[in-house]
Design a protein with these regions (language model features):
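Mature, folded catalytic cores of secreted/periplasmic enzymes
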Residues: 1, 39, 62, 105-106
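Non-catalytic extracellular/lumenal accessory regions of secreted precursors
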Residues: 12-59, 85-88, 93, 126-141
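Sec-dependent signal peptide recognition
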Residues: 2-10
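Noncatalytic accessory or regulatory domains flanking protease catalytic cores in secreted, cell-surface
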Residues: 54, 71-126
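Short proline/glycine-enriched turn/loop motifs at strand-loop junctions of beta-rich domains
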Residues: 57, 66-70
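Low-complexity, polar/charged sequence tracts that form flexible coils or short amphipathic helices
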Residues: 44, 63-66
Length: 141
């Protein structure tokens, strides 16, 4: 299977799962990936979904930072793209960061996960508006 097709299948599975909660622009959430979270079967990684209400044209930066695992982010929009924005290490080594201009108004799903199989541990998820904020502190795990 082509890599992007596998990603589309994974994201369709994720979109059917429960959301952990809602995060707004300007918010920070501290939580943990556990073995009780949603499992992305192709990668055997745990994941959480967070709902974000976005406006067309709004620029946001989404940061996922962890000292316990190599953070990975996906963003599913109201008009799901076959190539959704994703990131592994733009936040500095093992932290993930997405900065983008939202193409549509509606509910987005932020998928917080790891690039490592069965990884668990604490993380911080932050959504900011406007220009890209300063770089995250380097991962120290």
């Amino acid at each position: 299977m082509e890599p992007w097709r596998e990603l589309v299948v994974l994201l369709a599975l994720v979109a059917q799962g429960p959301t952990r909660g809602t995060i707004a622009v300007g918010d920070t959430v501290r939580d943990s990936l556990t073995r009780h979270d949603l499992v992305l079967p192709a990668e055997s990684t745990y994941a959480q979904q967070w709902r974000l209400r976005g406006r067309a044209g709004e620029t946001v930066t989404i940061d996922l930072a962890s000292t316990a695992f190599d953070a990975y982010l996906f963003l599913l929009g109201p008009n799901e793209s076959p190539h959704p924005p994703q990131d592994d290490d733009s936040g500095g080594r093992c932290n993930a960061r997405l900065t983008l201009r939202l193409p549509a108004t509606g509910d987005y799903l932020i998928v917080a996960t790891s690039s490592e199989r069965h990884a668990t541990g604490a993380f911080t998820l932050t959504v900011t508006a406007g220009p890209k904020p300063a770089a995250l502190a380097p991962c120290t795990r």
